[in-house]
Curated annotation (Swiss-Prot):
Zn(2+) binds at C346, D348, H516, C531. Its main location: membrane. Part of an energy-coupled inorganic carbon pump. The gene is dabA. This is Probable inorganic carbon transporter subunit DabA. Keywords: Cell inner membrane, Cell membrane, Membrane, Metal-binding, Transport, Zinc. The keyword Zinc applies. It holds the Pfam family DabA. Belongs to the inorganic carbon transporter (TC 9.A.2) DabA family. Forms a complex with DabB. The keyword Cell membrane applies. It is found in: Cell inner membrane. One of its GO terms (molecular function) is zinc ion binding. It comes from Paracidovorax citrulli (strain AAC00-1). Its cofactor is Zn(2+).
Length: 825
């Protein structure tokens, strides 16, 4: 009998352990990754939750993390009262949403005057905080978040601190050891008995999870939700851990960091309970269990309460879609003349105004849109460094290498190493413990020049940083080129890219590959303004590598056998669109034949005129005078790009709202306001639908990520944005930022990226994707990819197509005609 009892207990413990492990894994799976500062790409922070309907996710985020997913009601009230949302938009939104059947227009309008926030479900640290006898400056939540965050900053830092700590076998072990030896934290938290709880901490993460869950004694059905709520209190660091896991191979230790973080944050609540075993704590504990027993009911109520917010979200989008549809159906199409030149731009929304201006200035120029990595899925290693960095979308792994090549690499590498070593030694000298006094007294005046450069910014050109430490004589001949590929592989890549660009036949004599990059000073989040398709880098490396490949004589000789008919005179030129100043810079011009160089030079006045046109279009949003002389306006933007005190060098992708996958004839001359991503696609050339599938599963997902990062950072800037840029402190050299000197790691966009000081510049609209393809072809792609089914069926984006009779929208798996003249069309 005794043996049977022991076996039963062992089985029960094993079952409980398995359920805890499953709940922890489920909670961790809900966290989206956040890329580091030097590779910053936009991410939908709800990406791991898109398998659920949007409103259900909004309800869960509100109750589990106090996070707002839909636009705040006060902003919707402004849009309603200002006429941005019309009565027709509201009526159509109510008609479109089946769950809004019981709502009247008057109910929706009345809801705008009521607070839209929902009370989150409490965590153990929250109910313990309700003890009236506790007197401290910080809540338990604030104190614990700060301690966990500082621990993570020390553990993950590999670049910033000169004195690195011993990290031990993992994040949980590091935290436990840190807490055990920190004898002052109990005093700071007003818990002199904290050491008792710390001593009770289990040695391993798995035991800590079981220990903490045993203390909580929640019903099994609430475990995963409670654990997800725990992670959301340190969502920034959780997102960083998710990124490390995203990048790591199976079985790597980096895949365990997120679970370690969950165990740390979970264990803190149990530690507090160990320290506060009194009547108040027991009463608070009972209240916690009562609240979480009602969690399923609370979630259902929250989802119903948010129906009105979903209605207003759609109403806001319908107003924009009406305008978009009208502009698309009025687009006049391409001119009949054969283009004298072609310019391939990134699909980025900032390319749209420049493409429009170039075509208006020179009708014989044809512009094309393509993902900014130009089909070169490479990692780039600058000359003489080990700094291998991705130059492709974050969803993809690098498949090839780009390295710098030049005539005398040995001498250049030696010279660069020498200069970089001197710079590193100088920097380390300034960080000596006594340097805070002696260095400033002796050499502080030497920094007056740098300070003056910020107070009176100059008009210096953009510096990519890839040539830092390289003597000037080597820079013009240092070229990023594909390496390690055979002629057959290089030719196949060239053919693949040319077909995707639509240039397999009839290329112009001059084809410009125009990447893009931003220019700013003293900006920790500068990479977020560069090319997302190049993993937060500029498109220079990809454009140059591809142009050099396509101009290679051996590759050109091999292309006809692969079905590519490039005219012999066609020459490719790599260029970069500076999105801060709207200037275009060319590269490797010294390698061009005389005829091609002459053609490039003839286009320079067109670039200048088009750039001036775009600068005047952008000037009012930047507080500049659009009527200023051309040179004065350009000078002002150049100085802005070098101003270390400028928190808004440009607006980035603020305002993004649509993605058009279609021939340029569908959008040419349509004034899309810099709000649309544009990718060229000709369905007639894609007979098997393979290119359409690629576009819907790569660029479409990237634009969705961008759209939702801007949406989330606007709707909840405190929890899903990075706060005030003026208060940013860089963590770990490149990991992310703190707002101030602590708190959670901040993810998302800063307030200055979305708000001009008076009003919000970005409108939180779900992306409207418009595709020129048969409905059957689109449905075939959707049917093959569950991620697309989830995004569409669960309301994360809108999908339209160009039909024979006009625009059509997809709704509930069916296609409906759009009337471009009707409200909400």
């Amino acid at each position: 009998m005794h043996t049977d009892t022991l076996e039963h207990d062992a089985l029960a413990r094993a079952g409980a352990h398995a359920r805890i492990q499953a709940a922890c894994a489920q909670a961790c799976s809900a966290i989206a990754p956040a890329w580091p500062l030097d590779r910053a790409i936009a991410v939908n922070p709800h990406w791991q939750r898109t398998g659920q309907p949007l409103r259900r996710v909004a309800a869960r985020m509100a109750l589990l993390g106090g996070i707002q997913v839909f636009p705040p009601r006060e902003r919707q009230r402004e849009a309603w009262q200002g006429g941005r949302i019309t009565p027709q938009d509201l009526a159509l939104a109510l008609q479109r949403l089946p769950d809004a059947a019981g709502l009247a227009e008057a109910d929706c309008v009345a809801a705008l005057d009521r607070p839209g926030g929902l009370q989150p479900l409490p965590l153990l640290i929250d109910v313990l905080d309700n003890d009236p006898a506790r007197d401290t400056r910080l809540t338990w939540r604030q104190a614990i978040t700060h301690q966990v965050s500082q621990t993570c900053a020390a553990f993950f830092d590999r670049a910033q601190a000169d004195w690195q700590p011993e990290r031990g076998p993992g994040l949980y072990a590091f935290w436990r050891d840190t807490l055990t030896h920190d004898h002052g934290i109990g005093t700071l938290m007003g818990l002199p008995g904290l050491h008792r709880g710390v001593q009770a901490l289990p040695a391993t993460r798995e035991d800590a999870e079981a220990w903490a869950m045993h203390h909580l004694q929640l019903q099994g059905g609430a475990w995963a939700d409670y654990l997800e709520a725990v992670l959301l209190t340190v969502n920034g660091w959780a997102s960083w851990c998710a990124y490390l896991a995203w990048q790591a191979p199976e079985g790597a230790p980096e895949r365990e960091h997120l679970r370690d973080l969950l165990a740390i944050r979970l264990a803190w609540g149990a530690v507090l309970l160990e320290c506060k075993d009194d009547a108040a704590a027991r009463q608070a504990f009972a209240a916690l269990q009562a609240e979480w027993r009602r969690a399923p009911e609370r979630l259902q109520q929250a989802e119903q309460a948010l129906v009105v917010d979903e209605v207003w979200q759609l109403a806001l989008e319908l107003g924009y879609q009406r305008e978009l549809a009208g502009r698309l159906v009025r687009a006049p199409g391409l001119p009949s003349a054969v283009p004298e030149a072609q310019a391939v731009f990134c699909i980025d929304v900032r390319s749209e105004p420049l493409r429009r201006a170039l075509e208006a200035t020179a009708p014989t120029l044809q512009t094309l849109g393509f993902a900014g990595f130009f089909g070169v899925p490479a990692a780039y290693t600058p000359l003489g460094t080990a700094a291998r960095r991705p130059q492709l979308p974050g969803l993809l792994p690098p498949a090839m290498e780009v390295t710098d090549q030049l005539p005398d690499p040995g001498a250049a590498v030696t010279a660069r190493h020498r200069r970089l070593a001197w710079a590193a030694q100088w920097e380390s000298t300034t960080r000596w413990p006594g340097a805070a006094f002696s260095f400033v007294e002796a050499l502080g005046a030497g920094y007056l020049g740098k300070l003056g450069g910020w107070l009176w910014p100059r008009e210096q050109a953009r510096d990519s940083g890839d040539h830092a430490g390289l003597p000037a004589r080597y820079r013009p001949v240092c070229r990023p080129m594909l390496s390690g590929l055979s002629l057959e592989e290089r030719a196949a890549l060239a053919a693949r890219v040319l077909k995707a660009l639509g240039l397999a036949r009839g290329a112009a004599p001059l084809v410009m590959l125009v990447g893009h990059g931003s220019q700013s000073a003293n900006n920790a989040q500068a990479a977020a303004l560069d090319c997302g398709a190049c993993c937060g880098q500029t498109g220079e490396v990809n454009a140059r590598a591809l142009a050099l490949l396509l101009n290679d004589a051996e590759v050109r000789t091999a292309l006809p056998a692969l079905g590519i008919a490039l005219p012999e005179a066609t020459c490719f030129v790599a260029a970069l669109h500076n999105t801060t100043t709207d200037e275009i810079e060319g590269f490797d011009l010294d390698l061009l034949p005389p005829e091609a160089r002459a053609r490039w030079e003839r286009w320079q006045p067109v670039f200048s005129a088009a750039g001036d046109r775009v600068r005047r279009e952008r000037a009012p949003s930047l507080g500049l005078d659009a009527r200023a002389a051309a040179g004065d306006l350009l000078s002002a933007l150049r100085r802005r790009a070098n101003d270390g005190a400028q928190t808004r060098p440009e607006w980035g992708l603020a305002g993004n709202a649509a993605f058009v996958i279609a021939p340029r004839s569908r959008t040419r001359d349509a004034e899309l306001g810099g709000r649309a991503f544009l990718h060229d696609y000709d369905p007639a050339q894609d007979t098997d639908g393979s290119l359409l599938e690629l576009l819907m599963t790569a660029p479409m997902l990237v634009t969705h990520w961008i759209n939702w990062q801007y949406h989330a950072s606007t709707c909840d800037p405190e929890r899903l944005g990075s706060g005030n840029k003026l208060l940013h402190n860089v963590v770990g050299g490149h990991i992310g930022v703190f707002e101030g000197n602590g708190g959670d790691l901040r993810i998302g966009l800063s307030r200055q990226s979305l708000h001009d000081g008076q009003r919000w510049v970005h409108e939180p609209l779900r992306l409207t994707v418009v595709i020129d393809a048969p409905a059957a072809a689109i449905e075939a792609v959707i049917g093959k990819h569950s991620v697309l089914q989830q995004l569409l069926d669960h309301g994360w984006l809108h999908l339209w197509r160009f039909g024979d009779a006009g625009l059509e929208r997809r709704e509930g798996g069916r296609w409906f005609a759009q009337d471009a003249g009707a409200s909400g069309a």
